[in-house]
Amino acid sequence: LTDKLHQEVGEDVDAIIVFLGTNDYNGDLPLGNWFTEKAEHVQRGKGGKDFEDVRLHRTLSMDQGTLRGRINVAMKHLKELYPTKQIVLLTPLHRGYACFGKGNRQPSEDYQNEQGLYIDHYVDVILETAHVWAVPVIDVFALSGLLPTMPCHWQYFCNEETDQLHPNTEGHRRLAKTLLTQLSALPCTWE
């Protein structure tokens, strides 16, 4: 997807915004680890003397079967393609019930997925990304005010009976206002 974006628009972007997590939760994706570790010999100096030590060395996990691994793969690729652009991640919104037909019923966030995880676990991983990859993360899970698990908030979602997952026009307006205030505090480019 990032290659397609780069082919179509090249460097002509102000910023790259990645909204992720909700499909990973619904798809029962394991969280995984940010790093793998291996003991290695390393040269170092201290007190005027050089010597060799054995220390754990961590490298980024590129395990695409996990959320952290997928984030690492995507962030490495984005950082390499767009080193002068601001990259911003968004946490998912809260999730209400959704039914898109037989075989596609999605319980609300009040239920664990098949990994035994709640949506909050995925939100936490996305928030951690800021520290691993030096990118801002806008926590729309917390800041948007959209809470489809409460019937009074169904007015912001597509259908109160079948789609409390996707925001409607008013829900998008709330999300847009949240993003406007958060994004205005960030520089777009480093040039």
Give the label of every model feature segment:
Residues T2-E191:
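Alpha-helical cap/lid subdomain in secreted, periplasmic
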